[in-house]
């Protein structure tokens, strides 16, 4: 059925993206990062794997162990730090990332806990971050700097009462959420745009059945993160468990600096 709110949200995201692209073309940038993994290869130096994360023979990046996914925490990151803002100018990067993933439930197990695309100061998995902490938050620390988009499959006491997509900043109590009608085993395609001019993080999620979910939130990256961040995915389980597999991932950022001499354009990848 026609949903005017969804159409409006998509148009707003497209307008935001083209404004972002026009701005990037007008100015010089030499601090952009761009990569595109249409699949993954074992031993690829472009990806750092931590915890139970592994690359399977079929080119899929598994964040949990397919043989024994109980009490798993897996993290996969782009291997190099990504400049996200510049102290000399105060400028903040804009970026776009697209990825596709599958969540596979396990017969007889409670489906939990979820997967997060994130930007964070460090590569390592935080201590005390199993299960509902999604491998991103140390439950014993009052402050955990990160920005992320979570795909949460289990309702903890701080969560909405169903599976959901959320935008997070330094807390798993999401700034904004939308219900996620997850279908086990189906491919989910995600595009995320951060527009530094409006400080808006926008997300479009397309499901295999054609359903589209959108969510957006103002997030000040400079207020949360240092000048360089690590970018990637994290997933965690306990006795409640699922399989979390990344099929493809692209990322492009543009950061204007005082000494820039070249320009990098941004693009949204699509996956068949």
Swiss-Prot record:
Which Gene3D superfamilies does the protein's record reference? 2.60.120.200
> Which Pfam families does its entry note?
Lectin_legB (PF00139)
Q: Which CDD domains match?
A: lectin_legume_LecRK_Arcelin_ConA (cd06899)
List the Gene Ontology MF annotations in alphabetical order: carbohydrate binding; metal ion binding
Question: Which controlled-vocabulary keywords does the entry list?
Answer: Calcium, Glycoprotein, Lectin, Manganese, Metal-binding, Signal
Per the UniProt entry, the glycosylated residues are 36, 39, 65
InterPro entries in UniProt: ConA-like_dom_sf, L-lectin, Lectin_LegA_CS, Lectin_legB_Mn/Ca_BS, Legume_lectin_dom, Leguminous_Lectin
The region annotated as signal peptide is 1-29
PROSITE patterns in alphabetical order: LECTIN_LEGUME_ALPHA, LECTIN_LEGUME_BETA
Q: How does it assemble?
A: Homotetramer.
Gene source species: Robinia pseudoacacia (Black locust)
Q: Does the keyword Signal apply?
A: yes
- For this entry, the protein name equals Putative bark agglutinin LECRPA3
State the family it belongs to. Answer: Belongs to the leguminous lectin family.
């Amino acid at each position: 059925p026609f949903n005017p709110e969804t159409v409006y949200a998509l148009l707003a995201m497209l307008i935001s993206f083209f404004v972002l692209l026009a701005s990037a073309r007008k100015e010089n940038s030499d601090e952009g990062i761009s990569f595109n993994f249409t699949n993954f290869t074992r031993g690829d130096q472009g990806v750092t794997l931590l915890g139970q994360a592994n690359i399977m023979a079929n080119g899929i990046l598994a964040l949990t162990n397919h043989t024994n996914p109980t009490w798993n925490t897996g993290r996969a990151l782009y291997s190099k730090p990504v400049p996200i803002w510049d102290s000399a100018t105060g400028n903040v990067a804009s970026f776009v990332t697209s990825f596709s993933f599958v969540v596979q439930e396990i017969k007889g197990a409670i489906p939990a806990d979820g997967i997060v695309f994130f930007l964070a100061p460090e590569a390592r998995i935080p201590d005390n971050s199993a299960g509902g902490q999604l491998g991103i938050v140390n439950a014993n620390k009052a402050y955990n700097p990160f920005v992320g988009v979570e795909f949460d499959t289990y309702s903890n006491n701080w969560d909405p009462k169903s599976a959901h997509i959320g935008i997070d900043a330094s807390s798993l109590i999401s700034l904004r959420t939308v219900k996620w009608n997850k279908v086990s085993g189906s491919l989910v395609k995600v595009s995320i745009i951060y527009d530094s001019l409006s400080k808006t993080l926008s997300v479009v999620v397309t499901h295999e059945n054609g359903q589209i979910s959108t969510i957006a939130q103002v997030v000040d990256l400079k207020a949360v993160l240092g000048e360089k961040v690590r970018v990637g995915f994290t997933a965690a389980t306990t006795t409640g468990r699922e399989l979390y597999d990344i099929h493809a991932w692209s990322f492009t950022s543009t950061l204007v600096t005082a000494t820039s001499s070249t320009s990098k354009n941004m693009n949204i990848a699509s996956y068949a």
